[in-house]
Amino acid sequence: MKHEEANKEIGGRGAEGQRSKRVGGNSKIQNIQSPAPNPQPIVPNTQSPVPNLDNWLEIGKIVSPQGLSGELKVYPVSDFPERFEVPGKRWLLHLDGTEPQPIQLLTGRYISNKNLYVIKLAGVENCDQAEALRGCKLMVPASDRPQLAEDEYHVLDLIGLEVFMQASGELVGTVVDIIPAGNDLLEVKLHPSFTTDKKQKTVLIPFVEAIAPVVDLKSNRIEITPPPGLLEINN
């Protein structure tokens, strides 16, 4: 399951969200743009109004400098690698900023054992300039959602779907979150009619085709065929 964009691509306003896929696979969009000429050093905005991010998606957060040449470590909230590896225009939201500011992504690479990207932005040439961007968010316009492959879904589209037992039609509950894993998991808040155990509020359901064979966004429903005991044992 790949995640992408919901003002964050997973759960929450302002982050790119993520795409979710019931079986493995990757969809890459090559949208390469040339670096801007004569890049200028970036100076954080010193104002502090609340930003309006309705039209923006967060794809990552700058966590620290990397080395002495201005590279930056970014924690991704999107699992589209092209967001961090394909050169082109991105936007920076400074800690006290009201509007994301355009910036050119020059290079990027993934550090798999840390789940971080190391990127180079135009105009960030040394450690001090990189340090000034700690905590800033990388953004893209909300209209810039990558196309999804078959059996991939935007996380925002899955949140709120009702989950039903396919065989009986019984309402199980509502999807409240997506848990990234080897096979992503649907976190489902149980409907009161489905369980007599008041302590059990949610269950985790593997988002694989064998268990969730029907995803009907138009009808706002997912149909599941869980193996015996799954809905009880994973709580």
From Swiss-Prot:
- Top-level division of the source organism's lineage: Bacteria
Composition skew (Basic and acidic residues), residue ranges: 1-19
Keywords from the named record: Chaperone, Cytoplasm, Ribosome biogenesis, rRNA processing
Please state which protein family the record places this protein in: Belongs to the RimM family.
Q: Name one GO biological process term.
A: rRNA processing
Quaternary structure note:
Binds ribosomal protein uS19.
How is this protein named in the record?
Ribosome maturation factor RimM
Quote the entry's note on domains: The PRC barrel domain binds ribosomal protein uS19.
**Domain PRC barrel per the UniProt entry, residue ranges:** 150-230
What's this chain's function?
Answer: An accessory protein needed during the final step in the assembly of 30S ribosomal subunit, possibly for assembly of the head region. Essential for efficient processing of 16S rRNA. May be needed both before and after RbfA during the maturation of 16S rRNA. It has affinity for free ribosomal 30S subunits but not for 70S ribosomes.
Q: Where this protein primarily resides, as one coarse class?
A: cytoplasm
